[in-house]
């Protein structure tokens, strides 16, 4: 996709599952793949920019723009659904010759990471689900607004207020940046094709079966912001209940942007959780 010159959102390009894929790849060590959410104009860099540098100090961090998002390819005949996105994520691992990785999934990306771990358990060492989809719930007004976004500065400003608990993080400059991202050529067309109304079906389409979730063998860290208006806290309570080897961390005074509103704590929490597996592999 066409990108602003010298944009930090551009990493390197690989072909994954036949899709030209924009990818950020930094650090060394056991690989961690980070799967972004589904906000308008989203990119992997926009989602993970505040935590990738810290996590990359101790591991290889891989953050792709998923099919149809950011600066990855948008084929005219693309089908957008959970299984296609799982195939794309597995394609990223295959293209990089990575047999197994830790996964972090944010919101929509959590639903993809969860489904990947269920379908391909041998490809996943540990799992982190943050403000995650993956179980069915009545769609919130916040999520319906996000997926139903019609490009305008005012609409983007309103959405950012829904995303963040801390209103000091939201200003007109940020809203203008995210609005401009959402109207780059091809961005809104593919976004609108993903989640047309009625949108409850897309919540359900990202959900995995309870029995499959209960059968997950992976150590899993479930993270949520208590004041999240996009994905209800109850989804993470359910995931923590169903996943046998789960632990749950709830950030107070936090909306849907855990990795932004509590970036240092998020990086430390995730880093420590993954370091346990690093230590076990050495001992």
Swiss-Prot record:
Active site: 107, 228, 256
Pfam family, one: Abhydrolase_1
Catalytic activity: (2Z,4E)-2-hydroxy-6-oxohexa-2,4-dienoate + H2O = 2-oxopent-4-enoate + formate + H(+)
Endpoints of the signal sequence: none
GO molecular function: 2-hydroxymuconate-semialdehyde hydrolase activity; carboxylic ester hydrolase activity
Metabolic or biological pathway, per its Swiss-Prot or TrEMBL entry: Aromatic compound metabolism; benzoate degradation via hydroxylation
GO biological process, one term: benzoate catabolic process via hydroxylation
AB hydrolase-1 domain segment(s): 32-262
Function: Catalyzes the conversion of 2-hydroxymuconate semialdehyde to 2-hydroxypent-2,4-dienoate.
Similarity comment: family membership: Belongs to the DmpD/TodF/XylF esterase family.
Protein name: 2-hydroxymuconate semialdehyde hydrolase
Species the sequence originates in: Pseudomonas sp. (strain CF600)
